[in-house]
């Protein structure tokens, strides 16, 4: 049994914010913001990377049912290429917080920097393994993005996206060099850009 984080740490109207998908060579960066309800405990919350896929899927449904408010947002590949991955991630986090149906009094952001927000915010390094609301956000973002990559694997077969979720694994890099980039590959990322540079020459 995975005990997860102490739900007593949940505070009123504090949003946790996290992202998934900064490192992949393709697909969007997905963010989530979650305000947990202290009166409706969710057991087993933890950093999404520490949970099994089945546990993440179960918690995904429970978080959406029990949270006071939640929002999943994103920045598209075109925005990542235009803005760079850091700025696109900040934009997607901003969208997640702005999309909440309840205004938080504070937003806690996983990592070491905050996006520009209309509410007070603070960064929390390794927040997804310390703050229950950030852990919940990490689960919503990861399950949402993983499901999308499984769908995109059907649209762009041969790259193995359902398995590696767009990350630069040996399988992905080999398929990329053999098949070339798809419309959902990030042109600003070195392995994709280098392939395009070679094809232009």
Curated annotation (Swiss-Prot):
Known catalytic reactions: Endonucleolytic cleavage to 5'-phosphomonoester
Pfam families xrefs: RNase_HII
One cellular component term from this protein's GO annotations in UniProt: ribonuclease H2 complex
Keyword terms, alphabetized: Cytoplasm, Endonuclease, Hydrolase, Manganese, Metal-binding, Nuclease
Keyword Nucleotidyltransferase: no
Cofactor(s) this protein requires: Mn(2+); Mg(2+)
Class of enzymatic activity (EC top level): hydrolase
EC number(s) per entry: 3.1.26.4
InterPro entries: RNase_HII (IPR022898), RNase_HII/HIII (IPR001352), RNase_HII/HIII_dom (IPR024567), RNaseH-like_sf (IPR012337), RNaseH_sf (IPR036397)
Cofactor note text: Manganese or magnesium. Binds 1 divalent metal ion per monomer in the absence of substrate. May bind a second metal ion after substrate binding.
Compartment list: Cytoplasm
Residues engaged in binding a divalent metal cation: 18-19, 110
Alphabetical list of HAMAP family matching this protein: RNase_HII_B
Family membership: Belongs to the RNase HII family.
Function: Endonuclease that specifically degrades the RNA of RNA-DNA hybrids.
Protein name as annotated: Ribonuclease HII
């Amino acid at each position: 049994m995975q005990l997860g984080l102490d739900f007593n740490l949940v505070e009123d109207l504090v949003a946790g914010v996290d992202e998934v998908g900064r490192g992949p060579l393709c697909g969007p960066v997905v963010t989530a913001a979650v305000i947990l309800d202290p009166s409706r405990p969710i057991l087993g919350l933890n950093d999404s990377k520490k949970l099994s896929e089945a546990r993440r899927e179960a918690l995904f449904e429970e978080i959406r049912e029990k949270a006071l408010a939640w929002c999943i947002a994103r920045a598209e590949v075109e925005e990542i290429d235009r803005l760079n991955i850091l700025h696109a991630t900040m934009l997607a986090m901003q969208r997640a917080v702005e999309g909440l149906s309840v205004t938080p009094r504070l937003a806690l952001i996983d990592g070491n920097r905050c996006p520009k927000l209309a509410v007070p915010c603070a960064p929390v390094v390794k927040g997804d393994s310390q703050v229950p609301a950030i852990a919940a956000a990490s689960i919503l973002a990861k399950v949402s993005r993983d499901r999308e990559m499984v769908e995109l694997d059907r649209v762009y077969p041969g790259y193995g996206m359902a398995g590696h979720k767009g990350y630069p694994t040996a399988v992905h890099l080999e398929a990329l060099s053999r098949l070339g980039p798809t419309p959902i590959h990030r042109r600003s990322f070195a392995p994709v850009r280098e392939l395009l540079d070679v094809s232009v020459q």
